[in-house]
UniProtKB/Swiss-Prot annotation:
Binds 1 zinc ion per subunit. Zn(2+) binds at H581, H585, E634. One of its GO terms (biological process) is establishment of localization in cell. Its cofactor is Zn(2+). Residues 76-732 form the Peptidase M13 domain. This is Kell blood group glycoprotein. Its EC number is 3.4.24.-. Heterodimer with XK; disulfide-linked. The lineage of its organism: Eukaryota, Metazoa, Chordata, Craniata, Vertebrata. Belongs to the peptidase M13 family.
Length: 732
């Protein structure tokens, strides 16, 4: 589009040049116009020189015009990264579809049956980590790098894992006192076994205990006690008939585990059945989160002594002290409990079992541990788990999980235990200083556009606008990876306690203990930094309310979403819209009922209703639905994020010439901007969309585009077309 504007101005410029030549040639004194005989040779020479000078000026002016045209107009980007992106767009889009009626299919029509764009990028990032881990290097002995590579290789050594068989797991069971299933059981103290399971193996059979922020003081850590994480779907989410089938399948799975560990089939059946009975009774004690929140019982502060009175079967002090070493706990230590009634009922059940069926209680705990550790065991355990997952997904009408290669599992586990080490290696290769600098410049442009936009929102008064602008100005941004993750000297210290054993299971258990100790230690720092909720190679950005920081991991700022060599239209349309979306989450509280008392609530409510009606009017593919009460905040961030990114891009074009385009697409820079935005949303609709806080992919494309007048202008959409409605909403 810029090139076209430039060519329209060219004739006017040349007309002015011609005029200059005419004026120049007429400049002469009255004396020179007299017919003096002796001056004729000089006059001829002067005319020749004048003509040469005029021709030279015209030539220079033409060269200048050509140079400006070449540098201001959109030139095709012929680099390898641009050609790869061009091919990606051509492969995923269906340009036979009219963009003004179905831009999602225009951009994603051939990509509907593939994974979504974010999943594809996540897989690429894991492949990069795989290549890093499989390159032979000479690392400093005992370093985090050496241990990470050794752990990955141990995970990939399936021959050694198969050869070890159940031996390493049997040793663990013996250390815990054994169980009746194998015929060897020592009647140990129940709380001693529970303490070992929690502190040494990261297994919590009856409740969950973890460190989290204090409800009233987000930067103060506090131990939190919650319902356990069950290995089967919760009963309230399933119909009664399906619920019974689910437990039958789970019983079959537990029988397989007991048999694989050498148990007598009749004993295995008996103990597995009672384990299922215990789980079923624990299910009955659960109360939904919404109910607890409505009753004001989701965050209850109690001391360890008080908890001991409520649930006396558990030795809370010794179990928690062992789990959260090096914290120093006392009976007066305050805890946050998320379901007191569950803990009371759970304690009564444990006391009943200890009186009558202590050995079955031991088997229940051991079976749960075997389930937890099964990913580190041989192929027989893996196959049993795969069959259970397949059956459960069929019963709950979920699509089958695609088979995952072994390397991906090993990359993920290595990343869990050695995140700082892998973060440094990943960032060094995929997010160097020049890439980070370009990403920060993009973020600055997006942030400035948001601040400008806040000044013109009709539903904000001046005081609220100033408050909002200050909040954006004070925001911290962490780009690529946290500083903590990129300090190799810290990584070396953190891994000193990891002892990689002779079996893969032993190595996993050592890493589990080390990771738990590191998490506790990080919470105990006097001035803790923001703890990232994602790994640097992940593809999810987020905003932390408690720390007022926005995080963009290096894994997100990769092709096809971002690259310093891409046309600016691509970076602003894809990564820029994501950045703007996350920034708008700073103000989600203002959009909630009563969240902005100083705002023009009538205008705000009208904008709410307008946006909801706007999204409800769009047609959806069959078997696709969404809940507008769940998706409203994300819809608002999608619409506003696109508008802010476009505003930032338009300002960038005014200040910086020389934009490029992707060759062979026949799209202007502005059209590429919108295409890049839509490309981010490419994925197949899912039945789970009805429970998602994000709208289905069609709506995430069509909702924001139809709310943006510039889209209809650049794609020349007829008035009244689906993506050029007669009226629009403005919230942000």
């Amino acid at each position: 589009m810029e090139g076209g504007d430039q060519s329209e101005e060219e004739p006017r410029e040349r007309s002015q040049a011609g005029g200059m030549g005419t004026l120049w040639s007429q400049e002469s004194t009255p004396e020179e116009r007299l017919p003096v005989e002796g001056s004729r040779p000089w006059a001829v020479a002067r005319r020749v020189l004048t003509a040469i000078l005029i021709l030279g000026l015209l030539l220079c002016f033409s060269v200048l015009l050509f140079y400006n045209f070449q540098n201001c107009g959109p030139r095709p980007c012929e680099t390898s990264v641009c050609l790869d992106l061009r091919d990606h767009y051509l492969a995923s889009g269906n340009t036979s579809v009219a963009p003004c009626t179905d831009f999602f299919s225009f951009a994603c029509g051939r990509a509907k049956e593939t994974n979504n764009s974010f999943q594809e990028l996540a897989t690429k990032n894991k492949n990069r980590l795989r290549r890093i881990l499989e390159v032979q290097n000479s690392w400093h002995p005992g370093s985090g790098e050496e241990k990470a590579f050794q752990f990955y290789n141990s995970c990939m050594d399936t021959l050694a894992i198969e050869a070890a068989g159940t031996g390493p797991l049997r040793q663990v069971i013996e250390e815990l006192g054994g169980w009746r299933i194998s015929g060897k059981w020592t009647s140990l103290n129940f709380n001693r076994t529970l303490r070992l399971l929690m502190s040494q193996y990261g297994h919590f059979p009856f409740f969950r205990a973890y460190l989290g922020p204090h409800p009233a003081s987000p930067h103060t850590p506090v131990i939190q006690i919650d319902q356990p994480e069950f290995d089967v779907p919760l009963k309230q989410d399933q119909e009664q008939k399906i619920y019974a089938q689910i437990f039958r399948e789970y019983l079959t799975y537990l029988n397989q585990l007991g048999t694989l560990l050498g148990g007598d089939p009749s004993k295995v059946q008996e103990h597995s059945s009672l384990s299922i009975s215990i789980t079923s009774r624990l299910f009955q004690f659960l109360r939904p989160l919404e109910q607890r929140r409505a009753q004001g019982k989701l965050f209850q502060m109690v001391t360890i002594d008080q908890l001991k009175e409520m649930a006396p079967a558990i030795d809370w002090l010794s179990c928690l002290q062992a789990t959260f070493t090096p914290m120093s706990l006392s009976p007066s230590q305050s805890l946050v409990v998320h379901d007191v009634e569950y803990l009371k009922n759970m304690s009564q059940l444990v006391e009943e079992m200890l009186l009558k069926q202590r050995d079955f209680l031991q088997s229940h705990m051991i079976l749960g541990l075997v389930v937890t550790l099964s990913p580190a065991l041989d192929s027989q355990f893996q196959e049993a788990r795969r069959k259970l997952s397949q059956k459960l997904r069929e019963l709950t009408e979920q699509p089958p999980m695609p088979a995952r290669p072994r390397w991906m599992k090993c990359v993920e586990e290595t990343g869990t235990f050695f995140e700082p080490t892998l973060a440094a290696l990943f960032v060094r290769e995929a997010f160097g200083p020049s890439t980070r600098s370009a990403a920060m410049k993009l973020f600055t442009a997006i942030r400035d556009a948001l601040i400008t936009r806040l000044r013109n929102l009709p539903w904000m008064n001046e005081e609220t606008q100033n408050m909002a602008q200050d909040k954006v100005a004070q925001l911290q941004v962490e780009m690529g990876a946290s500083e903590w993750a990129l300090k190799p000297e810290l990584a070396r210290q953190e891994y000193n306690d990891i002892q990689l054993g002779s079996s893969f299971l032993q190595s996993v258990l050592s890493c589990v203990r080390s990771l738990r100790a590191r998490i506790v230690q990080s919470f105990l720092q006097p001035h803790p930094q923001h703890r990232w909720k994602v790994s640097p190679w992940d593809v999810n950005a987020y905003y932390s309310v408690s720390d007022h920081v926005v995080v963009f991991p290096a894994g997100l700022l990769q092709p096809p979403f971002f690259h310093p060599g891409y046309p600016r239209a691509v970076n602003f349309g894809a990564a820029g819209s994501i950045m703007a979306h996350e920034l708008l989450h700073i103000f989600y509280q203002l959009l909630l009922p009563g969240g902005c008392l100083a705002c023009d609530n009538h205008a705000l409510q009208e904008a709410h209703l307008c946006l909801k009606r706007h999204y409800a009017a769009f047609p959806l593919p069959s078997r696709t639905s969404f809940n507008d009460s769940l998706t409203f905040l994300e819809n608002a961030a999608d619409v506003g994020g696109l508008a802010i990114a476009l505003q930032a891009y338009s300002k960038r074009l005014l200040r910086h010439h020389g934009e490029t385009v992707l060759p062979s697409l026949d799209l202007s820079p502005q059209q590429i901007f919108f295409r890049s935005y839509a490309q981010v949303m490419c994925r197949k609709p899912s039945p789970q969309d009805s429970h998602d806080t994000h709208s289905p992919p069609h709506l995430r494309v069509h909702g924001p585009l139809s709310s943006t007048p510039a889209f209809a202008r650049y794609f020349r959409c007829a008035r009244g077309a689906l993506l050029n409605p007669s009226s629009r909403c403005q919230l942000w």
